Curated annotation (Swiss-Prot):
EC number: 7.4.2.8
Species the sequence originates in: Rickettsia peacockii (strain Rustic)
Binding site for Zn(2+): C890, C892, C901, H902
Membrane topology designation: Peripheral membrane protein
Protein family according to the UniProt entry: Belongs to the SecA family.
EC class of the enzyme, as a word: translocase
Gene field: secA
Gene3D superfamilies given in the database record: Helical scaffold and wing domains of SecA, P-loop containing nucleotide triphosphate hydrolases, SecA, preprotein cross-linking domain
InterPro entries: Helicase_ATP-bd (IPR014001), P-loop_NTPase (IPR027417), SEC_C_motif (IPR004027), SecA (IPR000185), SecA_CS (IPR020937), SecA_DEAD (IPR011115), SecA_motor_DEAD (IPR014018), SecA_preprotein_X-link_dom (IPR011130)
Region (Disordered): 862-887
Disulphides: none
GO biological process, one term: protein import
Protein name in UniProt: Protein translocase subunit SecA
Compartments, record wording: Cell inner membrane; Cytoplasm
Length: 906
């Protein structure tokens, strides 16, 4: 019934596209008039549009004319005219939706339409892509159109200085990678003045390869971190011990990606740990004193049994580097958390880096939800449409191709073993190579690509390998994959964003030329050669895409297929599978094995059966559903931190903007004074129960007040009067500082102390949340909802953090002093700014993890309570410890956290 209705009325997508086509006629009707404009008149249209917006017009009022102007500019500058389907894609993007357009349909050109239109507001547009190469390429090629129309263009890539980034972000249209945008947002919220920040307020983002960024990378948060405890030696020792375990000592679940010691395994590892003097004889791994070792053992087990080199990570230049499972690319600057990365470094016998503590983090899910208006484009989004709608409130519209797709998608071939599968692939590659048909062979990992490469080397078949190890050559290799007799092996979607043109890409070959010798003649020669090869390739059948395995996601398989048949070109695709493949083995092997036994599969023989295809699709849907739930669950937990992050970042901005910090100082002084007095002089208590001695100690610790006991000797004194006296004394101390140092210097000092203190307590809070998150799932065994428990405890920790902020701020303000011996009064402000600058620069060093007001201003700005090097602390003398973070291990050596030991009463 549903299929009949769809035939009669079309799908919702068909109806949307039909409606959009009716709007395209309005743009096309403007083309003759726009074509008659001179270059100068066309450029002046930008000024005209801005004036209309200034006078109250909306973007929708000028959308058709603006699109017509961009189309004409693209034709004059780049020789490219937007097709009607590209105009439809532009309207979809402008309206805050995702457009699904096949590979080769010119998505980069489509983005110029909404980017230009929305940039007219002057609030900036971000065009987001997945790597530096694409950001540079698109800003250079499409930037010509924007510049022609009088708009500025910026490009953001890794390693740029802040001044260059700031200028790029201030441009009308900025091309940037998703990673740099996220990290710049985090870095900006660690800066100490608004002038240092590089980003403008969020406005509109167009995300290229939107499925890759919003779905594939959603599970991996961006993290800025600093090193903590040096446990490298322990990781090394545990690694050696784990290598001695037998297969029966642990059990793993590949579906859930978990691993646990068995009873025999626990006994075995306890014996090994005891021999190495890591635990005491006759103690258990799970005794309280040894509990921290469980974490090291578990991570070493995971490193050796759940993670594979050249599949999950690779080792390059003595470093373990994570491979993105969806793209096959190295994830630069990313490290596994919770000690897993250190365990992998121990496994691979490279230098073990210190464990990191989170200083700032955000997921792409929460970063991109900051934009008031968000859109995206990709070749494959319909399979993930429900998730994109649910999480980002983004609708997906599939746009028809400009030319009819002539690509032929052949049925899968399934073999009993990997060897039989490779034999069949090799035979097909040999046949295609002999007739000159180019091939793109997709693998799911570096390991598999190198495995296949060695097979082709033995057969003496020339080929190129494209994987994370050769990232720099990625675009060039993939661009030439359509040449005559070309054989290219690629991991997943490596090279995504670069078209494969039949016969080859002449522009990239021309870029390789030496401009000094016969440049023009060589260009003509290359173009002639490419044209000839294109004819030969079309005669041979176009690009043949071979999939060596099904991916967990149907979308990734569709992306691989989409590399062939661009813009109506001929082509073929085919997947080769075996029962040894990961997807088949883990998720679908039993069902499919039964079918194959029934059908009587013989060695070297392929099978085609609709039941097998359905089983594979069900397996993929099962994994997609599992991954979706993981991303959704991550978002639920991250939303808790995100709400707190927004509050902290907003407060930080308010502090930086503030012209006067006295309000916060006075209110916090009064709040703490009341709290301290009531702690030692409870309401309704008898005078003899008052603890005046400890009240005096606490007032000196917090406010630097020397409290006179005689004040309390009066019979009629009350706690309210004591509180009032304390507040007056605190105000007097502050006033004295202000008179000594100047009100401007005190304001700057207070602002800076408040910012550094906020950074310190926020960092400690993130550390606490990390630990809370790690163990919260165990609450389910106690019939409690882990998410509800996490929300409740995270809120309590946040309140505690705010209380710590107030106390540390007050303590530092009332205790610090500035040495003015060598500073003239009128130069104090300048001197302080210089000191402040030095301090900030140390903050920006990612290796710097200890935020406290006294670190870099040791001679000029000295808080009484400073952090002491742990090596200089005497366990038996608490006065030698300095300030101890509540989450540090207590310096007394008890093994407990400070807040549960000597700091329990603080």
């Amino acid at each position: 019934m549903l299929s009949i209705l769809k035939k009669l009325f079309g799908t919702a997508n068909d109806r949307t596209v039909k409606k959009l086509f009716s709007e395209i006629t309005k743009i096309n009707s403007l083309e003759p008039a726009i074509q008659k404009l001179s270059d100068e008149e066309l450029k002046n249209k930008t000024v005209e549009f801005k004036e209309k917006l200034k006078n109250g017009a909306t973007l929708d009022d000028i959308v058709y004319e603006a699109f017509a102007v961009v189309r004409e500019a693209a034709k004059r500058v780049c020789g490219m005219r937007h097709f009607d389907v590209q105009l439809i894609g532009g309207l979809i993007l402008h309206r805050g939706m995702i457009t699904e357009m096949r590979t080769g349909e010119g998505k980069t050109l489509v983005a110029t339409l909404p980017a230009y239109l929305n940039a007219l507001t002057g609030k900036g547009v971000h065009v987001v892509t997945v790597n530096d190469y694409l950001a540079r390429r698109d800003s250079a090629s499409m930037g010509k159109i924007y510049n022609f129309l009088g708009l500025s263009v910026g490009c953001i890539v890794g390693g740029m200085p802040d001044e260059v980034k700031r200028a790029a972000y201030n441009a009308d249209i900025t091309h940037a990678t998703n990673n740099e945008l996220g990290f710049d947002y985090l870095r900006d919220n660690m800066k100490y003045s608004l002038q240092e920040r590089v980003l403008r307020p969020f406005n509109f983002a167009i995300i290229d390869e939107v499925d890759s960024i919003l779905i594939d990378e959603a599970r991996t948060p961006l993290v800025i971190s600093g090193p903590v405890n040096d446990n490298a030696e322990l990781y090394g020792k545990i690694d050696k011990i784990v290598r001695l375990l037998n297969a029966s000592d642990f059990e793993k679940d590949e579906k859930l990606k978990t691993i646990n010691l068995t009873e025999t395994g626990i006994t075995h590892i306890e014996s090994l740990l005891s021999k190495e003097n890591i635990i005491k004889p006759d103690t258990s791994l799970y005794d309280f004193e040894n509990l921290t070792l469980v974490h090291y053992v578990n991570q070493a087990l995971r490193a050796h049994n759940m993670f594979t080199v050249n599949v999950d990570y690779l080792v390059r230049e003595g470093k373990v580097m994570i491979i993105d499972e969806f793209t096959g690319r190295v994830m630069e600057g990313r490290r596994y958390s919770e000690g897993l990365h250190q365990a992998l470094e121990a496994k691979e016998n490279v230098k073990i880096q210190n464990e990191n503590q989170t200083l700032a983090s955000i997921t792409f899910q929460n970063y991109f939800r900051n934009y008031p208006k968000l859109s995206g484009m990709t070749g494959t989004a319909m399979t993930e449409a429900p998730e994109l709608k649910d999480i980002y409130n983004l609708d997906v519209v599939a746009v028809p191709t400009h030319n009819k797709v002539t690509r032929l998608d052949l049925d899968d071939e399934i073999y009993g073993s990997k060897k039989e599968k490779y034999d069949a692939i090799l035979k097909l590659i040999r046949d295609c190579y002999d007739r000159g048909q180019p091939m793109l062979v997709g693998t799911i990992s570096i390991e598999k690509s190198e495995e296949l490469s060695s097979v082709l080397n033995k057969e003496k078949i020339p080929h190129k390998v494209l994987n994370a190890k050769f990232h720099e050559q990625e675009a060039f290799i993939i661009a030439q994959a359509g040449r005559f007799k070309a054989v290219t092996i690629a991991t997943n979607m490596a090279g995504r964003g670069t078209d494969i043109m039949l016969g080859g890409n002449p522009e990239m070959l021309i870029e390789q030329l030496d401009k000094e010798h016969n440049y023009e003649a060589k260009i003509a020669e290359i173009k002639a050669q490419i044209a000839e090869e294109k004819k030969q390739v079309i005669e041979a059948g176009g690009l043949f895409v071979i999939g060596t395995e099904r991916h967990e996601s149907r979308r990734i398989d569709n992306q691989l297929r989409g590399r062939s048949g661009r813009q109506g070109d001929p082509g073929k695709t085919k997947f080769f599978l075996s029962l040894d493949d990961d997807l088949m083995r883990i998720f679908a092997s039993d069902r499919i094995s039964g079918v194959l036994r029934t059908l009587g599969l013989k060695d070297g023989e392929a099978i085609h059966h609709p039941m097998i295809s359905r089983s594979l699709e069900k397996a993929q849907q099962k994994v997609e559903g599992h991954n979706y739930e993981m991303r959704k669950n991550l978002l639920r937990f991250d939303d808790v931190m995100n709400d707190q992050r927004k509050i902290i970042y907003e407060q930080r901005t308010e502090i930086i903007k503030s012209k006067d910090s006295h309000g916060f100082l006075n209110s916090t002084t009064e709040e703490l004074a009341k709290k301290i007095v009531l702690t030692f002089m409870p309401v309704g208590s008898y005078r003899e129960d008052w603890d005046i001695e400890n009240l005096s100690v606490e007032l000196h610790r917090v406010f630097s007040i020397k409290f006179d006991h005689n004040v309390v000797s009066k019979n009629d004194v009350t706690e309210e009067e004591i509180t009032k006296t304390v507040i007056q004394m605190a105000h007097y101390i502050y006033k004295s500082k202000e008179e000594a140092y100047s009100s401007e210097l005190m304001h700057n000092a207070m602002k800076y102390i408040l910012l550094t203190t906020l950074d310190q307590v926020w960092k400690d809070h993130l550390y606490s949340l990390d630990h809370l998150r790690q163990g919260i799932s165990l609450r389910a065994y106690g019939q409690k909802d882990p998410l509800s428990e996490y929300k409740r405890e995270a809120f309590n920790l946040f309140e505690q953090m705010l209380n710590n902020l107030k106390e540390l701020f007050i303590q530092t303000v009332y205790h610090f002093h500035i040495d003015l011996k060598n500073v003239q009064k009128e130069d104090v402000s300048l001197e302080y700014k210089k000191l402040q600058k030095n301090m900030r620069e140390s903050r920006e060093d990612p290796a710097f993890s200890k935020y406290n007001a006294g670190s870099s201003l040791e001679t000029d700005l000295k808080p009484v309570v400073s952090r002491i090097d742990p090596k200089d602390r005497n366990p038996d003398d608490p006065t030698s410890w300095g300030r101890v973070s509540r989450n540090e291990l207590c310096p007394c050596g008890s093994g407990k956290k400070y807040k549960y030991c000597h700091g329990a009463n603080e």
